[in-house]
A protein has these predicted regions:
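Hydrophobic structural segments
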Residues: 1-364
Length: 364
């Protein structure tokens, strides 16, 4: 398989447009036409992980955290990032990363945490905004099914767990073809009225070019009338963090022990106990201090995240316990997400989980 076959799939399944502005997800190292035969999946790219890829014969590493975050002006081995890049190039190992775009995915990092905790009624904590477009076009009624199918196949029409979503009304379109035209219906130079369907649907903004291309190819008219504009709707299935309900209420100290066991946390930092049993839990894999107010607003009794600052631990007050299980611990299951995603699409492609613990933090 070519590297570009795998990266094209990942770029589509976990859209790069969903990543934060500071992020650098996607292909980090490697030529797109390179042949790949096996992948090593990890959280971080380190010396030990590169060695492991060499021993295992893997010629691509798929990580959650990008090796390259900021612009690099030289490759002299001066920094750890430069040294790792040189080592990867020397070993002819490609590197691909899925970071904050995987964090916000509908089946992303926080959702995996919820799955491990067996939460029910899982919902997005902080939905992404401004990532939806509305498409309206006008189609001759006898070509409606063809056009609708084409834009659906291109990715339009998805709302939550529903696909093929659209709305259609009937009306009459008018036009007159000028010089050099070859109208599909009517005659050049004469006003024509045609029974048409107004077709409306929604799409993710990153699919706009693909959907419009499909529309233009399937539509019978020379000049296709369509409107496309951004929506202010929240995308309730995509965003940072999530909330969910425990199968039954649990005492706070018991819940701390459960969280520590599930996420293999060697040390847990947590705020003042509230004295309440925990029913609703909010989660955010990685550094989630910025979502404490969202977790409170959701009515959560506990919020599990990582990298919480000292003063932020006060924000839960007597309403919510804030639990910091560690960055590595909160995102360790990202490898499972990537594995499941890839193996479903490429069932014969060799995938391997890294056995290296890349957590840079040690505890006494």
């Amino acid at each position: 398989m070519k590297l570009q076959d795998l990266t094209a799939f990942l770029d589509s399944a976990i859209p790069l447009s969903f990543q934060e502005s500071y992020d650098n997800s996607g292909l980090q190292v490697g030529l797109p036409d390179k042949e790949i035969n096996s992948a090593l999946i990890c959280l971080d790219v380190t010396d030990e992980v590169l060695d492991e890829a060499g021993y295992a014969g893997c010629n691509i590493i798929i990580s959650h955290h990008p090796l390259i975050f900021h612009g690099i002006k030289r490759l002299s081995g001066r920094t750890i990032t430069e040294r790792l890049l040189l080592k990867a190039i020397k070993q002819d190992v490609a590197i691909y990363s899925a970071h904050t775009n995987l964090d916000v995915a509908g089946s992303g990092v926080s959702r995996k945490m919820a799955e491990k905790l067996k939460l029910q009624n899982v919902k997005t904590l902080s939905p992404l905004k401004g990532r939806l477009n509305k498409l309206i076009t006008y189609v001759p009624e006898d070509h409606l099914d063809k056009v609708r199918e084409a834009i659906f196949n291109a990715g339009a029409g998805i709302i939550g767990n529903y696909d093929y979503c659209s709305f259609t009304t009937s009306g009459t379109g008018s036009f007159r073809g000028g010089e050099g035209t070859n109208p599909f219906v009517g005659e050049k130079g004469k006003m024509h009225f045609e029974k048409e369907a107004r077709l409306e649907t929604v799409l993710f903004s990153h699919l706009k070019d693909k959907v419009i291309k499909a529309l233009l190819e399937a539509h019978p008219y020379e000049e296709v009338a369509y409107d496309i504009y951004p929506l202010d709707n929240d995308n309730i299935d995509i965003g940072m963090g999530c909330t969910g309900d425990l199968p039954e209420p649990v005492a706070e100290k018991d819940f701390l022990k459960v969280a520590g066991t599930i996420f293999s946390a060697r040390g847990i930092r947590y705020s003042k106990l509230t004295g309440k049993k925990i029913t609703k839990v909010a989660l955010c894999g990685g550094a989630g201090g910025a979502l404490i107010s969202d977790a409170l607003a959701s009515g959560a009794d506990a919020y599990i995240t990582a990298d919480v600052r000292y003063h932020s631990f006060f924000e839960g007050g007597n309403k919510m316990i804030i639990i910091d299980i560690g960055h590595y611990e909160s995102e360790k299951f990202s490898s499972e997400i990537l594995y499941d995603l890839i193996i479903k699409k490429f069932p014969t492609f060799a995938l391997r989980f890294s056995e290296v613990n890349t957590n840079p933090i040690n505890y006494l």
